[in-house]
Swiss-Prot record:
Reactions mediated catalytically: reduced [plastocyanin] + hnu + oxidized [2Fe-2S]-[ferredoxin] = oxidized [plastocyanin] + reduced [2Fe-2S]-[ferredoxin]
Membrane-topology annotation of the record: Multi-pass membrane protein
Pfam families named among the record's database cross-references: PsaA_PsaB (PF00223)
Binding site for chlorophyll a B1: H657
Gene that produces this protein: psaB
Protein name (record): Photosystem I P700 chlorophyll a apoprotein A2
Length: 737
């Protein structure tokens, strides 16, 4: 008989029950626990898997390009972006009747198609693509990259091409390479593409493989660059009357500092974007030459960390020992990377709608809503993952001897203070915010809405004014015509981005939306969610090695289950349990965030901000005027009289609820119930003629507590997000197309 799954663990492979299968899947990526693994082998496996990851990403983006080129309407959309709905791909579904075929044959298509709400049309158009042929070329190029990545992954698993452990531990070289080689050079390359291809295309000048060596991106060529007269490249920008994609009103500038938006496309000026990426490229290429490698010059990170000790002694040993702690722990490194990526992903969500970089994205409301929600949920998962790996670091990699009295040890030493402060903040926010909402609900219900407690967010309004919003009457900084931030001393010439002040005060974009009492309340509800999620995650990580109830968690690992009443009961005190509970809070917090964003924007887009302002100050307003009112199209998505192109979203809305509700079956029942049920079914099966001819290799047993919680959590999360995705897209698309 061949070896059983999982090959990486013989102990698990010999388990006679179905536990073998589930634990094999659960630990599939936990290379550290594999049989015969060495530290070097672990690093090599993870390194090679990165190439597989890249291959999947390239294949996926290639598929996007290919399907739009094959089944989409990119060339028609380019001719009239505001009035053409972009097609993602065709639908070939045997379940469709004639009515469905008619309903989904939309956007000028002759057969059923899906509408694209991902923003790829706007993205490709902005970066200079105009024809299906260019999309096909991109798809083929990415396929080749995908194949090369797969080959590279295979190659780096071969004995001659496996990097050794010291190569992986060389932090300075890796930093130089990632900062200068990856971030810096790729930003420079992107600047080059914008300057050489995208900006000329936006001015009606096609640049392709046939002529890119003949078309100079600027009439002055490289002379200003070499003579230091760089200001020439900022002169003569596109005018406010510029028609995107043509030479009407076009200028010649390639690097500008205009601020605000292109009046026609309502997106950032391409010349501003090019300038931004050039600045990033310069910064990162410089940063990529800062760290000491072969030549004995530059910074040593270890020396910097060891020297970073305040003279007053208030940080104890400071950062001594941290270099080796971080450099020898993959979980610490992954935690840092996930936290940084989580923040950046949330920033992408905020900036995609407030300062849209792609032409006409600001006019495609459903896509804006989809992109915001998509990026916020991804940010949430990345962030809880950061804390999970922080906890695993403390369980598996943390060495107290190596970190005596340094900043990390001191955080662990006063974890009670950190946890209790977070607890206090969460309680304060929770009671006060809910108290205000409930008070407002009661007075609304009793017919005295004038008795609501409505608080103007004056500090936030002041901050908006600082950035130039004039509505609130605070004359400060950018909202003060005499301020040094507006006008350089001794000149009447404004030094700020000239287009910024027009944009922030225009009212037809999402820059610094006008805020009032409803915003004040929901801001604090979101703050409650963020602080409570953080409390659970921080407590779970800081207590990962030991807590008041159970000071000896080290040998129990990251994800031990309830352990009976022996140590006073150990339910919900493993680091995994904290992660599990935090995910529910994370999902709810992002729920509130996306509800707020969507409802606020529906009012802005429809030109009716009064509904949000009046109804968002009490809970029934949210339930009735946001959730119920906007789900009515979905609840009636298909009925005895027929269906429409929202029917698939209506079905998905129901199906999402079903997946979500299924999660509770795993979350609310205890393991014994299922084990009893399985034993009964096994007994009946073995005594049923014919049926008992079928045998199993693994004895069926109930899921463990941790596994059932994971399955329940997965259903809860997937159902929750699928339900809201259907609601969001259908309610927005039904209003704006």
């Amino acid at each position: 008989m061949g070896t059983k799954f999982p090959k990486a663990s013989q102990a698990l492979a010999q388990d006679p029950t179905t536990r073998r299968i589930w634990y094999g899947i659960a630990t599939a990526n936990d290379f550290e626990t594999n049989d015969g693994i060495t530290e070097e082998n672990l690093y090599q496996k993870i390194f090679a898997s990165h190439f597989g990851h890249l291959a999947i990403i390239f294949l996926w983006t290639s598929g996007n390009l290919f399907h739009v080129a094959w089944q989409g309407n990119f060339e028609q959309w380019v001719k009239d972006p505001l009035n053409t709905r972009p097609i993602a791909h065709a639908i070939s579904d045997p379940h469709f009747g004639q009515r469905a075929i008619e309903a989904f044959s939309q956007a000028g298509a002759s057969s059923p198609v899906n509408i694209s709400y991902s923003g790829v049309y706007q993205w490709w158009y902005t970066q200079g693509m105009r024809t299906n042929e260019e999309l096909y070329n991109g798809a083929i190029f990415l396929l080749i990259l995908s194949a090369l990545s797969l080959f590279a992954g295979w190659l780096h698993l071969q004995p001659k091409f496996r990097p050794n452990l010291s190569w992986f531990k060389n932090a300075e070289s890796r930093l130089n390479h990632h900062l200068g080689g990856l971030f810096g050079t790729s930003s420079l390359a992107w600047t080059g593409h914008i300057v050489h291809v995208a900006i000329p295309e936006s001015r009606g000048q096609h640049v392709g493989w046939d002529n890119f060596l003949q078309v100079a991106p600027h009439p002055a060529g490289l002379q200003p660059f070499f003579t230091g007269n760089w200001g020439v490249y900022t002169e003569n920008p596109d005018t406010a009357n510029h028609v995107f994609g043509s030479s009407d009103g076009a200028g010649t500038a390639i690097l500008t500092f205009l601020g605000g938006f292109h009046p026609q496309t309502q997106s950032l000026w391409l010349t501003d974007i090019a300038h931004h990426h050039l600045a990033i490229a310069v910064l990162f290429i410089v940063a990529g030459h800062m760290y000491r490698t072969n030549f004995g010059i530059g910074h040593s990170i270890k020396e910097i960390l060891n020297g970073h000790r305040p003279p007053g002694g208030r940080l104890g040993a400071g950062h001594v020992g941290l270099y080796d702690t971080v450099n020898n722990s993959l979980h610490f490194q992954l935690g840092l990377a996930l936290a940084a990526l989580g923040v950046i992903t949330s920033l992408v969500a905020q900036h995609m709608y407030s300062i849209p970089p792609y032409a006409y994205l600001a006019r495609d409301f459903t896509t804006q809503a989809a992109l915001y929600t998509h990026h916020q949920y991804i940010a949430g998962f990345l962030m809880v993952g950061a804390f999970a790996h922080g906890a695993i670091f403390l369980v598996r990699d943390y060495d107290a001897e190596q970190n005596k009295n340094n900043v990390l040890a001191r955080i662990i030493d006063h974890k009670e203070a950190i946890i209790s402060h977070l607890s206090w903040v969460s309680l304060f926010l929770g009671f006060h915010t809910l108290g205000l909402y409930v008070h407002n609900d009661v007075v609304q219900a009793f017919g005295t809405p004038e008795k609501q407690i409505l608080i103007e967010p004056v500090f936030a309004q002041w901050i908006q004014s600082v950035h130039g919003k004039s509505l609130y009457g605070f004359e400060v900084l950018l909202n003060n015509a005499d301020s040094i931030t507006r006008v350089a001393p001794g000149s009447a010439q404004p030094i700020w981005l000239p287009g910024w002040l027009d944009a922030i005060n225009s009212g037809n974009n999402s820059l610094f939306l006008t805020i009032g009492p409803g915003d004040f309340l929901v801001h604090h509800a979101i703050a409650l969610g963020l602080h409570t999620t953080t409390l659970i995650l921080v407590k779970g990580a800081l207590d990962a090695r030991g807590s008041k109830l159970m000071p000896d968690k080290k040998d129990f690992g990251y994800s031990f289950p309830c352990d009976g009443p022996g140590r006073g009961g150990t339910c919900d005190i493993s680091a995994w349990d904290a992660f599990y509970l935090a995910v529910f809070w994370m999902l709810n917090t992002i729920g509130w965030t996306t509800f707020y964003w969507h409802w606020k924007h529906l009012g802005v887009w429809q030109g009716n901000v009064a509904q949000f302002n009046e109804s968002s100050t009490y809970l029934m307003g949210w339930f009735r005027d946001y959730l119920w009112l906007n789900s009515s199209q979905l609840i009636n998505g298909y009925n005895p009289f027929g269906m429409n192109n929202l029917s698939v979203w209506a079905w998905m809305f129901l199906f999402g609820h079903l997946i979500w509700a299924t999660g509770f079956m795993f979350l609310i029942s205890w393991r014994g119930y299922w084990q009893e049920l399985i034993e009964t079914l096994v007994w009946a099966h073995e005594r049923t003629p014919l049926a008992n001819l079928v045998r199993w290799k693994d004895k069926p047993v109930a899921l463990s507590i941790v596994q059932a919680r994971l399955v329940g959590l997965a259903h809860f999360a997937v159902g929750y997000i699928v339900t809201y995705a259907a609601f969001l897209i259908a309610s927005t698309a039904s209003k704006f197309g």
